[in-house]
């Protein structure tokens, strides 16, 4: 999805994923995959597998990949995580004089706070030691898509033109706290990247849904069971709708009176909740439609999930719903990548053109 977001102006020289479902999906959507895609554990790759010197290296990995277990072993030691496997390659490229001009590390917002901020500091230290300056931006896909999906984008570069440094709404409180927790030697490499806010989102969840007669709805009994999982506050949200309303429902585990209780929570703000990889029916997001005093419910379809990630309907999804939702729920929002590329990454690669355009 990062490749689609970057756009046709970029050429992908190398891509890697160890997940067979994601690998098959990549091949199905990119006819040139055989030229550069490697379906392998990142730890089995060598610098010789990466051609030339890239303008950009992009890494998306689970938050737990920044575990201190990897840092304690040294950033080049042990098969601790996908990220450290990636970083081992970046170090080797740097040693060979082929370090990427830019890097982006994309992750969940927990990266900023995990292990009391020590994991974020470990990432910053790794970048700083190799001569990169870096800064973090917390961007919620809800700025451009009807899905609440906050993510952190750590952007690293060897040079930082003055016109790309400044204030940004994406310097959230969490980013500022993470920055404040960096060791002084690492903080000296920090950059407050200037990134403008994109135009206001002009679509909502209902606009991306498939027609009512093209989807499978829950039985009345199943819908009632879903409603019974709601607290009085959330049931009231259903009951107070006076006209057709479309909402998103997540099942969550809440602690109530010292016990773990499964709850269904509904929102009618035009946004879906953050898509997740499915681990059974309870983790799949549901849709409710309230109309004429009646409530209907169903599961979000794979195509709807893909639309919530900004993917075109021409994007080929895996055949099974579970696999398709896994691909969508583990991806990066396409329009967010495009905005980041247009407003920051591309100007970093061509600062003269960026300054002339201002």
Predicted features by range, described:
Residues 1, 8, 47-54, 68-267, 355-358:
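Class I S-adenosyl-L-methionine
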Residues 1-3, 41-42, 52-70, 102-108, ...:
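Conserved proline-anchored active-site loop of SAM-dependent methyltransferases
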Residues 1-43:
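SAM cofactor-binding core of SAM-dependent methyltransferases
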Residues 6, 68-72, 287-289, 321:
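Short acidic, glycine/proline-rich loop/turn micro-motifs
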Residues 20, 62-65, 109-110, 143-144, ...:
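Short, solvent-exposed loop/turn segments at secondary-structure junctions
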Residues 212-358:
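C-terminal target-recognition/interaction regions appended to catalytic cores
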């Amino acid at each position: 999805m990062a490749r689609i977001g970057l756009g046709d102006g970029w050429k992908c020289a190398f891509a890697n994923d160890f997940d067979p479902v994601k690998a098959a999906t990549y091949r199905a959507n990119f006819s040139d995959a055989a030229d550069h895609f490697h379906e392998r554990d990142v730890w089995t790759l060598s610098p010789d597998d990466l051609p030339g010197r890239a303008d950009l290296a992009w890494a998306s990995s689970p938050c737990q990949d920044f575990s201190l277990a990897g840092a304690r072993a040294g950033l080049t030691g042990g098969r601790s995580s996908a990220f450290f496997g990636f970083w081992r390659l970046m170090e080797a490229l740097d040693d060979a004089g082929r370090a990427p001009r830019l890097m982006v590390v994309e992750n969940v917002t927990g990266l900023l706070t995990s292990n009391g901020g020590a994991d974020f500091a470990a990432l910053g230290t790794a970048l700083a030691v190799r001569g990169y300056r870096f800064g973090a931006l917390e961007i919620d896909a809800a700025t451009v898509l009807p899905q609440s999906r906050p993510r952190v984008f750590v952007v690293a570069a060897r040079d930082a033109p003055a016109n790309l440094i400044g204030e940004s709404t994406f310097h959230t409180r969490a980013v500022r706290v993470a920055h404040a927790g960096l060791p002084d030697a690492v903080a000296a490499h920090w950059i407050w990247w200037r990134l403008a806010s994109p135009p206001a989102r002009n679509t909502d969840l209902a606009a991306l849904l498939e027609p009512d007669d093209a989807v499978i709805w829950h039985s009345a009994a199943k819908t009632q069971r879903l409603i019974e999982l709601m607290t009085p506050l959330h049931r009231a949200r259903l009951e107070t709708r006076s006209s057709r309303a479309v909402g998103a429902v997540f099942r969550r585990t809440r602690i109530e009176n010292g016990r773990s209780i499964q709850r269904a929570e509904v929102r009618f703000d035009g946004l879906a909740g953050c898509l997740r990889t499915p681990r059974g029916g309870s983790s799949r997001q549901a849709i409710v439609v309230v109309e004429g005093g009646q409530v209907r419910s169903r599961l979000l379809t794979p195509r709807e999930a893909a639309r919530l990630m900004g993917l075109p309907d021409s994007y080929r999804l895996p055949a099974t719903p579970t696999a398709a939702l896994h691909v969508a729920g583990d991806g990066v929002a396409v329009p967010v990548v495009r905005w980041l590329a247009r407003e920051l990454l591309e100007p970093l690669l061509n600062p003269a053109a960026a300054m002339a355009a201002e």
